[in-house]
Amino acid sequence: MEIASKYNPEEVESKWYNYWMEYGCFISVPDGRKPYTVVIPPPNVTGVLHMGHMLNNTIQDILVRRARMKGYNACWVPGTDHASIATEAKVVGRLAAQGISKQDLGREEFLRHAWDWTHEHGGIILEQLKRLGASCDWTRTAFTMDESRSESVIKVFVDLYNKGLIYRGIRVVNWDPKALTALSDEEVIYKETNGKLYYLRYFVENEPDKYIIVATTRPETIMGDTAVCVNPNDERYRWLRGKRVIVPTVGRAVPIIEDEYVDMEFGTGCLKVTPAHDVNDYMLGQKHRLESIDIFHDNGILNEHGGPYAGMDRFDVRKKIEQDLIDAGLMERVENYVNKVGYSERTDVPIEPKLSMQWFLQMESLAKSALDAVMNDEIKLHPAKFKNTYRHWMENVKDWCISRQLWWGHRIPAYYLPDGSIVVAETAEKAVELARKQTGSDSLTAEDLRQDSDSLDTWFSSWLWPISVFGDVMDPENEELDYYYPTSDLVTAPDILFFWVARMIMAGYEYRGKKPFDNVYLTGIVRDGQGRKMSKSLGNSPDPIMLMEKYGADGVRMGLMMAAPAGNDVLFDESLSEQGRNFCNKIWNAFRLVKGWQQAETATQPEASALAVKWFGYRLDEVKTELDDLFSKYRLSEALTLVYKLFWDDFSSWYLEMVKPAYGQPMDAKTYGSTIGFFDQLLRLLHPFMPFITEELWHALASRHDGETIMLCLLPDAHETDRDFLQAFDRTREIIAAIRNIRTGKNVPFKEKLTLEAGNEHDASFDAVIIKMGNLEAINRVEEKTSGSTSFLIGTLEYAIPMGALIDVEEEIKKLSDELAYQEKFLASVMKKLGNESFVAKAPQAVIELEQKKKSDAEARIATLRDSLNQLQSTK
């Protein structure tokens, strides 16, 4: 295979992705191998690729590709989420641009438009993932609203309802006035907001000269007040017992109630109770049997209970009522106040706590197994620091509001009979059967039943994802589930740890009796170089497709992963992608160098080459072992850095230089074969991180058959290394580096040969390497170094290079004097520590021994430096 002079990512990437698809390299079917399973966190069907997707899916692809190369039957299931709120908002917006409202169309026609939108946009992000190199089994692509997933969702709803875990009731919910739907607590984002604290006068009924002051941040809700609450232990308000007060502007008398829920230190210690518009007030209202007055329409406009403010927007009312209260003498004062306000995650408008009839799922009984699994490490979170967050959520779990006032989504399978009673069934036909049994009336037909108009929360389908992607959740004989479930690793963001991860764990134990996955890898947030979260509004989020066009997919993957420690935020800068592209070029050029060497079958292997081959073989095995350890701990960023340094430093900068034949000379066949073998192993280690360039070069490395691919090659096994040999070689590299530094410092060109003088303690095993890499005439053993030579220390051993007229004696004396002063100061600090009786008495023996070694090493260096200085000064 011909190799181009320059790496062209665009050409290489399209070629090999098509090749992988053509030969079905990503496809997984159950067989005798151990499975490795990952399900993609399904992106919104309306979405396009952003940097968070890039990070998440790069990590998944690395894990999946490495598992394939470890011999597992790797199955990565892709798919998309129907995203009820987001998709419905997009479709409503498109229709509005045409002057059409959702209500004008009706449900069925609106859903046709929604499906058209989904088919038009649903495949975009999946195609973009292919550009990244995602090795998903695309034959398994799932959609949370496709037929199979929908059947499972409806069956699970019916099952949970029949178990008594799903119920319908009136509760205060988080209401989105823009999307016109209820939200779960997890769909509300709290933001610090600059607001005001209003101190209002509530006059005592029939006592016009007496009033109490009530502090509130929401004066627009006073029309819904049905009580004022004080703490029974608050002496200030004992006189109010049994009395009633008048709600300002409304004129309605409401009772004073007492409850220890009230914080005596907040505001004035008097709390206005508005049961229909605050979850805590609702609980007080239930406890004290208060009336609930809902003053808002669904869109945030005040209804007929709003009195003179009916028909006005809630925030306009806040401004108007403030002035009206001031004018009426009912406002004591107004203070600036920073408050945490709940916003809809999807529409970014302040939510409205609102009394509403909704469907709920009881969570407490489901949560126990899910909590125990994580706390007992049956399911491991990486990093483990998120266990405390998880525990806090699960120990304070609330019932899940699962109904949404939307048309796009799984319609709730509840049917209302003419008498108002309910039946829940998988289909309308089954609902009729149930209704007939329930009522004893065989004359009931489907026309007599009315299906609930609400849809299920999107997460109600997503929580079944690790099960439903393999077929019917309720099928106990599901062979695919038996093989692939539980899945191996889940890669996701910490912000949906409860939203999604915890709920999947609950569903796993409820419907399979098993955990849904073994490990959860929690990524960080991708931020810019200034630490800001990437967002469209800030304009600091690069287009991933443009990045890949500029730097190549492998370059961008590498740039992201180099800065992505598990659980910590990623500070991404475009220069990281440039670094990734440069590494691709380094690999490419190293390959071209190696393939450009000629072989001589009969040539004898030089000693330096034999040592280099032995060293790099051991070093490679050492890295393989480290990689296994890092992957087991999900430290992928460190794993990539390790392989990067192995290739760039150890292989390219050292090994290739050590074995490189003289200009115009061939290489012996033994060294060449070893070098090609090393390159093959390096490409395999790099492949999970950089799939495209490694596939291209692996095919160029040797003749391959159609359908062969590096991704199905096994990773090379690690063998035992000789650590003494590696340590000795590290000292050899230090000697070579010191020689090079002297050449640079003295401006001695590399082509000019030097002589190295060493003492008798020097290990001559690697002299052939030192002579070649340092371009030396010889290495001489001497009792005393040549006068006027330049010396250096490796550990406690001194080496010298006779420089003759090349050396500046005064400059060398100054350099050695500075080093001597540093070593003497260092020795003094060690001596002081060892002379401290308290330190010696308390420090572990190993620490004391380390300090004693520092002392002896420093003393040896000082003696050597003094000797070198004396010799130099004698030449002056």
Curated annotation (Swiss-Prot):
<keyword id="KW-0648">Protein biosynthesis</keyword>
<keyword id="KW-0175">Coiled coil</keyword>
<dbReference type="GO" id="GO:0006438">
    <property type="term" value="P:valyl-tRNA aminoacylation"/>
</dbReference>
<feature type="coiled-coil region">
    <location>
        <begin position="804"/>
        <end position="876"/>
    </location>
</feature>
<dbReference type="InterPro" id="IPR033705">
    <property type="entry name" value="Anticodon_Ia_Val"/>
</dbReference>
<dbReference type="InterPro" id="IPR009080">
    <property type="entry name" value="tRNAsynth_Ia_anticodon-bd"/>
</dbReference>
<comment type="similarity">
    <text>Belongs to the class-I aminoacyl-tRNA synthetase family. ValS type 1 subfamily.</text>
</comment>
<dbReference type="InterPro" id="IPR001412">
    <property type="entry name" value="aa-tRNA-synth_I_CS"/>
</dbReference>
<keyword id="KW-0547">Nucleotide-binding</keyword>
<protein>
    <recommendedName>
        <fullName>Valine--tRNA ligase</fullName>
        <ecNumber>6.1.1.9</ecNumber>
    </recommendedName>
</protein>
<dbReference type="InterPro" id="IPR019499">
    <property type="entry name" value="Val-tRNA_synth_tRNA-bd"/>
</dbReference>
<keyword id="KW-0436">Ligase</keyword>
<dbReference type="InterPro" id="IPR002300">
    <property type="entry name" value="aa-tRNA-synth_Ia"/>
</dbReference>
<dbReference type="InterPro" id="IPR014729">
    <property type="entry name" value="Rossmann-like_a/b/a_fold"/>
</dbReference>
<dbReference type="GO" id="GO:0005829">
    <property type="term" value="C:cytosol"/>
</dbReference>
<comment type="subunit">
    <text>Monomer.</text>
</comment>
<dbReference type="InterPro" id="IPR037118">
    <property type="entry name" value="Val-tRNA_synth_C_sf"/>
</dbReference>
<dbReference type="InterPro" id="IPR009008">
    <property type="entry name" value="Val/Leu/Ile-tRNA-synth_edit"/>
</dbReference>
<keyword id="KW-0067">ATP-binding</keyword>
<comment type="function">
    <text>Catalyzes the attachment of valine to tRNA(Val). As ValRS can inadvertently accommodate and process structurally similar amino acids such as threonine, to avoid such errors, it has a 'posttransfer' editing activity that hydrolyzes mischarged Thr-tRNA(Val) in a tRNA-dependent manner.</text>
</comment>
<dbReference type="GO" id="GO:0002161">
    <property type="term" value="F:aminoacyl-tRNA deacylase activity"/>
</dbReference>
<dbReference type="GO" id="GO:0005524">
    <property type="term" value="F:ATP binding"/>
</dbReference>
<dbReference type="InterPro" id="IPR010978">
    <property type="entry name" value="tRNA-bd_arm"/>
</dbReference>
<dbReference type="GO" id="GO:0004832">
    <property type="term" value="F:valine-tRNA ligase activity"/>
</dbReference>
<keyword id="KW-0030">Aminoacyl-tRNA synthetase</keyword>
<feature type="short sequence motif" description="'KMSKS' region">
    <location>
        <begin position="533"/>
        <end position="537"/>
    </location>
</feature>
<dbReference type="Pfam" id="PF00133">
    <property type="entry name" value="tRNA-synt_1"/>
</dbReference>
<dbReference type="InterPro" id="IPR013155">
    <property type="entry name" value="M/V/L/I-tRNA-synth_anticd-bd"/>
</dbReference>
<dbReference type="InterPro" id="IPR002303">
    <property type="entry name" value="Valyl-tRNA_ligase"/>
</dbReference>
<feature type="short sequence motif" description="'HIGH' region">
    <location>
        <begin position="43"/>
        <end position="53"/>
    </location>
</feature>
<dbReference type="Pfam" id="PF08264">
    <property type="entry name" value="Anticodon_1"/>
</dbReference>
<keyword id="KW-0963">Cytoplasm</keyword>
<dbReference type="Pfam" id="PF10458">
    <property type="entry name" value="Val_tRNA-synt_C"/>
</dbReference>
<feature type="binding site">
    <location>
        <position position="536"/>
    </location>
    <ligand>
        <name>ATP</name>
    </ligand>
</feature>
